[in-house]
Amino acid sequence: MASLRLAAGALEEPAAAAAMPLSASLPSKNYDYDYDSVQPYFYFEEEEENFYLAAQQRGSELQPPAPSEDIWKKFELLPTPPLSPSRRSSLAAASCFPSTADQLEMVTELLGGDMVNQSFICDPDDESFVKSIIIQDCMWSGFSAAAKLEKVVSEKLATYQASRREGGPAAASRPGPPPSGPPPPPAGPAASAGLYLHDLGAAAADCIDPSVVFPYPLSERAPRAAPPGANPAALLGVDTPPTTSSDSEEEQEEDEEIDVVTLAEANESESSTESSTEASEEHCKPHHSPLVLKRCHVNIHQHNYAAPPSTKVEYPAAKRLKLDSGRVLKQISNNRKCSSPRTSDSEENDKRRTHNVLERQRRNELKLSFFALRDQIPEVANNEKAPKVVILKKATEYVLSIQSDEHRLIAEKEQLRRRREQLKHKLEQLRNSRA
């Protein structure tokens, strides 16, 4: 805006004779005053990089004197970006339509509050005129000109200038049949203005989506899908850089790939946010349920008081698994007992857990005692599935049989002792008789 206003102020005095009032009745020849003729006032480039040299070589316009050669050094302002290429390639050679520079000048005067006949700029039913002009210009963008964007714009501008120089003489010298496209517009200011507005609408429809320029989303909201019948010019932002049709297709392909990544990242960010929110809500909820059991593999060596100290008993795999599970449950109960809070409910739970642990320990010791007793009884020593009742009965019978054997052996011992006494007394009698 500042550059355009400064340019307009600089051109008011030199171009007073060529000034053109913006009116619907103005002939189309006044719009031949191209912005390219005053481009050196705004953008200083070397001769090989000046893409506007073609317009200066035509010689159809006379460049007015510059207000100051070092204007940018005086005000320490950056030069404006290069002019965007026009989208009206088919009508580029026609001199009855205003150029892109005139479009920018018209928009500048309109936005600056100048007295302009708005009925010529846009019809009441066409509201996308100003937006289409703003979209086509790089200087309305809100982002800094990156290296890639400058390269693309420069290449497209050079191609457009070359095609414009070659297409003009070729079209004028070729006496071929009339084109099969739409008929040429009728002469006159009203007809030229109508075709000009129609061409601007088509150019706005070819504009690319702003997401191509901004591959990363500017906000966390997902872009809304456009309705099928929506106007493309109304859906586009004002900071979209211009591009040709082929470049638009390439940018759309890149846009599809970038959108997939962006949506994936957005989905991941939303899923991570939801998971973190659920985790925080779970942490904030009070825990009314009992503590979760934690598997702790701790080896606890228990002494079997019923078994002999020197006897090593080896149990089957199933029984060893049962014993290990009992020990693990005991350790878990001890851990839960230590970690539970000291409240009335927790104390009752601790007592109950302690009782359960002691009961399990008693049962385990009793089971070990039965196993040891079974190993001492010959009849059920090899029977691993012998019930406790059978073990007790066989143990009782075995004890009784042992006791009967003991009594029998004691009686035999007594008889032998008596026999010995008798034999000893008889031996003494024989010794006394010889003497």
Curated annotation (Swiss-Prot):
Record keywords, A-Z: Activator, DNA-binding, Glycoprotein, Nucleus, Phosphoprotein, Proto-oncogene, Transcription, Transcription regulation
Glycosylation sites: T80
Places the protein is found: Nucleus
Biased composition, class Low complexity, residue ranges: 231-246, 264-278
Locus of motif 9aaTAD: 105-113
Presence of keyword Nucleus: yes
Subunit architecture: Efficient DNA binding requires dimerization with another bHLH protein. Binds DNA as a heterodimer with MAX.
Free-text comment about domains: The 9aaTAD motif is a transactivation domain present in a large number of yeast and animal transcription factors.
Protein name: Myc proto-oncogene protein
Organism encoding this protein: Gallus gallus (Chicken)
Taxonomy of the source species: Eukaryota, Metazoa, Chordata, Craniata, Vertebrata
Encoding gene per record: MYC
